UniProtKB/Swiss-Prot annotation:
The keyword Plastid does not apply. Residues 864-932, 940-967 have a biased composition (Low complexity). SUPFAM superfamilies: Homeodomain-like. Residues 60-97, 264-283, 311-352, 587-621, 653-680, 774-806, 864-967 are annotated as: Disordered. This is Chromatin modification-related protein EAF1. It comes from Yarrowia lipolytica (strain CLIB 122 / E 150) (Yeast). It holds the Pfam family HSA. One of its GO terms (cellular component) is NuA4 histone acetyltransferase complex.
Length: 967
């Protein structure tokens, strides 16, 4: 069963295609009087002789006489052979009946008028036929614009073909052509007549034209040969069936039995007597051993053809009866009355059967002969004498007028290029006998209709009852529903399938839906005498409950819920066509109502906890990828440098690469805010706990994994852990130093300096230390040697005793001129030290490296000052105040002693210890990576315990110092 959507869309496409063809031909001949006259004449002829209504032609009005009628040939008689088979007799009898002169009313009337006139039309398909309904270009353009195929095709189901898409493109071309024509009309450049078509020069047939002709001929030849082979196969199948049914004696050709000659041939007997045809003589018995001795030359049977030709002609071959038409016999009663065994007749082939292997012109009636003589004969290409000199002619090029525009091309030609406009009357053919009862008793028996059971379909859910849209039923819909219900015996699914709207265009409105339940509900409204208690089936109780709920809801609601019957008087004009417009109108009303209805107060948007500065500093994924790449690159460089470090001395520092910028900063990175002492202490404790937990987790993991990991991976993990541990130790040392310094200053009654003040003081110390170191170096250089980057005016030597005082005197000047040449040198040394720390520890951040560099510079300055005082012998006691020092401020030695514990390790010493540990691990190749990792973890735990003890000792010392002045 074809899908209704598919059938509907196919009808739309074919109708639209036909209209476009009409537009093409109308545009081809817009005001051509001869074309209009030809159309009118052809239309008048079709109205007079309606071939679709099977009307006969009026021979008196036929325009032309073809030829005079030929006399009917007389039928010759012949005596049948008594020895023929029963099957041949039956065939002969049937052929006699077929060859009996049978004349229809048309043929008799034609013979009486002697075929004075005859009508035969061979119409090419490219000539337009008159249309029953012609539309103008403007109307067709309006139709294609209001409902174009380009919008209908995407919503179609299972009907998307190439022809449909081509038709949609053709509609677009039509719109362009119409717009151009209207533009020319407004400009006054569109004339009522078209210019004469340009005649192209005559061209000869090319090789491609000959190939196309051969292709057409081969197609026809193969098609006809296939038909002939099918007919031959059918005849062979019938012959095999007769052979198995009637046997060899009735179906095979009777031949004379083989007569074998003796060894000695009597030539006298052979010359005297002729060979006699005796079918009753049995074959002589011959010894098989003797037969083998007969030569091939003597085994040939001598046949006298003159004797055979002189005998009376008989039908001894089935091929003769088929190839040559048999003549009727006058003694047909003898043949029919003979003793013929009753056998079922073979399948009779009608005269118009395609399996007829021969056709005789003598069997045709005069009208058929006249038509046969006038039919065109198909000949192979190139059969003419001068086929190459024949000019090529295209029937489409012979048109006198050109198309309106190149956008509208001619429609493709059909396969049946010639259409014969002559049909036989159906009165000449005997109608087939109809059965008395053409309808099946499966659905039409009275007993079944009396005992039919009405089953209810599945009802919808009752919770959607309040939102239901009523369906509209016209009078035609009600009558069709009642007819389908009676015809299909209350099969609601089939009734629903037949009640679906024919033209849906991919959308069905709610008022046009015809589901199984809606059909049953409307049928129940049309039959008020039917009781719901008579329903049967699994959904009978649910249907009763739904009907009761629907009646109750309809009584309480003002809106229509049940189906609505509409009469013809109440239908508005163009009701079905305006349903889409009403649907869009309803959509617009609902949108307008939604806009006008007051909306509830929206909740205030939640403010993000991130400030604007934090949002700006958030790194993007690209920035994070770059940071990750830089970090991996630095780690790789550090690993490469460590592999090259065993050749250096233990205290020697690796060279500083010059390609790394001094002020390197990652994108999105900002300096951390200042932290209080409590935050620093909490951060230090959290890092210690995290390190202890990580070490414990790593021990458990290594204990579980064992020797499964590769040694290279274990070494990389050891190095990563060493760098992390070293960075944590440096940060903890810095935190402890700051805490002890702040605690000591609180005990002395001083305000602890801010991070900015501490940084400025450190810079001053670094600058003073660099100046003192430079002056000390100048004292040791020989005369005339100037260091790089120093002016000759600065070559004055300073005594060692005045180095510290001069450094203290130059600090205010350096603070006042931070951008001078003397301040640039310490900054360069400081940046070089920061780069060196970052190369040694790639995981170390820029801020931590800067802090470590300041600490090292401060220690270096203190050491230089201590060495200078010892050299001068002016080392003051610990509690003595220097001149110029404010009261209540501790001396530098006291500050350095209180801020730097005795057991605090420097980064250089820690690097030396790490190198020694690596050498110890490399010197013990017998240990596995897991054992080395466990040993390293134990060493880390011991260092953590020592640091904890140092912190406790520092806290007790600070408490004792705080209690001393108070006492």
């Amino acid at each position: 069963m074809m899908d209704p959507r598919q059938e509907t869309c196919g009808d739309i496409v074919s109708t639209r295609k036909r209209r476009l063809e009409e537009l093409y031909y109308v545009s081809l001949h817009p005001r051509y009087p001869q074309g209009l006259d030809a159309k009118q004449k052809l239309k008048q002829f079709q109205d007079q002789f309606d071939l679709t209504q099977n009307r006969l032609f009026d021979e008196n009005k036929l325009p032309k006489a073809v030829e005079e009628p030929k006399p009917v040939p007389t039928l010759q008689t012949s005596t049948p052979d008594a020895g023929s088979s029963p099957e041949l007799k039956r065939r002969r009898t049937s052929s006699i009946a077929q060859l009996s002169p049978t004349f229809s009313r048309t043929s008799l009337k034609t013979n009486e008028q002697q075929l004075q006139e005859m009508l035969l039309f061979l119409v090419p398909s490219n000539i337009p036929e008159p249309t029953t309904e012609t539309k103008s270009l403007a109307e067709l353009y309006y139709t294609t614009q209001t409902l174009p195929l380009s919008k209908l095709i995407p919503s179609a189901h299972k009907t998307l073909t190439t022809d449909s898409y081509h038709l949609a493109l053709l509609e677009g071309k039509l719109a362009v052509a119409h717009a151009r024509i209207e533009e020319l009309k407004r400009a006054g450049k569109w004339g009522p007549r078209q210019p004469k078509r340009f005649q192209d020069p005559i061209r000869r047939k090319t090789h491609w034209d000959h190939v196309l002709d051969e292709m057409e001929w081969m197609s026809t030849d193969f098609r006809e040969e296939r038909k002939f082979k099918q007919a031959m196969a059918c005849e062979i199948a019938f012959s095999v069936l007769e052979y198995h049914k009637y046997g060899k004696e009735a179906c095979c050709v009777k031949t004379k039995p083989i007569k074998f000659l003796p060894e000695e041939i009597n030539e006298s007997e052979d010359t005297e007597s002729k060979m006699d045809i005796d079918t009753s003589m049995p074959p002589p018995s011959i010894n098989p051993v003797e037969v083998t001795n007969i030569s091939a030359a003597d085994s040939v049977t001598v046949v006298d053809y003159d004797t055979l030709l002189s005998q009376p002609r008989t039908l001894s071959s089935t091929e003769e009866s088929e190839d040559k038409p048999e003549e009727p016999s006058t003694d047909s009663e003898e043949v029919v009355g003979g003793e013929v065994p009753k056998r079922p007749a073979a399948p009779k082939l009608p005269e118009s059967s395609p399996f007829k292997l021969y056709a005789s012109v003598d069997k045709l009636d005069p009208l058929s002969k006249a038509l046969f003589d006038n039919l065109p004969v198909t000949t192979p290409p190139g059969s003419a004498v001068n086929a190459l000199q024949v000019p090529y002619s295209d029937p489409l090029d012979n048109s006198k007028l050109a198309p309106v525009t190149h956008l509208l091309a001619a429609p493709p030609e059909q396969d049946d290029w010639w259409s014969v406009c002559l049909e036989d009357s159906p009165a000449d053919e005997d109608p087939l006998p109809l059965r008395s009862n053409t309808r099946s008793t499966l659905f039409n028996s009275e007993t079944m209709r009396r005992h039919v059971v009405i089953k209810a379909p599945q009802p919808p859910q009752t919770k959607y009852l309040d939102f239901r849209t009523p369906t509209m039923w016209l009078l035609a819909d009600d009558s069709q529903l009642l007819r389908l219900v009676k015809e299909y015996s209350y099969n609601w699914d089939i009734v629903s399938a037949h009640m679906l709207p024919q033209k849906t265009y991919g959308f069905t409105a709610n008022i046009e839906r015809r589901t199984s339940w809606q059909c049953f509900e409307r049928w129940f409204q049309l039959n008020p005498t039917f009781s719901l208690t008579d329903l049967r089936g699994p959904y009978a109780q649910a249907a009763q409950q739904w009907m009761a709920a629907a009646a109750k809801a309809q009584a309480q609601s003002k809106r229509r819920i049940s189906p609505l019957g509409v009469s013809n008087e109440s239908i508005q004009r163009g009701h079905r066509k305006l349903r889409w417009a009403s649907m869009f109108d309803g959509i617009r009303k609902s949108m307008r109502k939604r806009e006008t209805t007051p909306r509830p107060n929206p909740q205030p948007p939640r403010k993000s906890q991130l400030s604007e500065s934090n949002k700006k500093d958030i790194a993007s994924p690209l920035d994070l990828c770059k940071m990750k790449f830089e970090q991996d690159k630095n780690l790789a460089k550090a690993y490469a440098q460590q592999r090259m470090m065993p050749g250096q001395m233990p205290g020697q520092m690796p060279p500083v690469p010059s390609n790394i910028p001094a002020n390197r900063q990652f994108p999105g990175q900002r300096p951390p805010p200042p932290q209080t002492a409590a935050q620093i202490q909490a951060h230090t404790q959290a890092q210690a706990r995290a390190a202890a937990a990580a070490s414990g987790h790593m021990q458990q993991r290594m204990a579980g994994v064992g020797m499964n990991r590769m040694p290279g991976q274990m070494n990389d993990q050891h190095q990563m852990m060493q760098f992390d541990r070293q960075r944590q130790l440096m940060e903890q040392q810095k935190m402890l130093q700051q805490q002890q310094q702040q605690q000591f200053m609180r005990t002395q009654g001083q305000v602890p300096p801010q991070p900015g003040q501490v940084q400025g003081q450190v810079n001053q110390n670094v600058q003073g230390a660099q100046v003192a170191a430079g002056q000390a170096g100048m004292a040791q250089r020989p005369a005339g040697q100037i260091p790089q980057g120093q002016m000759p005016a600065q070559q004055g030597q300073v005594p060692p005793g005045q180095a510290g005082n001069q450094a203290q005197m130059m600090r205010p000047n350096m603070r006042m001129r931070p951008g001078g040449p003397q301040a640039a040198a310490p900054n360069e040394h400081l940046n070089a030290l920061i780069r060196q720390l970052q190369n040694q520890n790639p995981a170390l951040s820029l801020e931590a490296a800067t802090k470590l560099a300041h600490v090292q510079v401060q220690r270096f300055v203190q050491k230089q000052q201590r060495v200078a005082r010892q050299a001068q012998g002016q080392t003051p006691p610990q509690g003595q105040m220097r001149p110029g020092q404010p009261q209540g401020q501790p001396s530098p030695q006291m500050r350095s002693g209180s801020s730097t514990p005795m057991n605090m390790q420097s980064p250089q010493l820690m690097n030396v210890q790490l190198q020694q540990q690596q050498q110890q691990r490399s010197a013990s190749p017998g240990q596995s990576p897991a054992q080395q990792h466990a040993m390293l973890m134990r060493m880390n735990q011991q260092q953590q315990q020592q640091q904890q003890q140092q912190q406790n000792q520092g806290q007790t010392q600070g408490q004792n110092q705080g209690q001393g002045p108070s006492e």
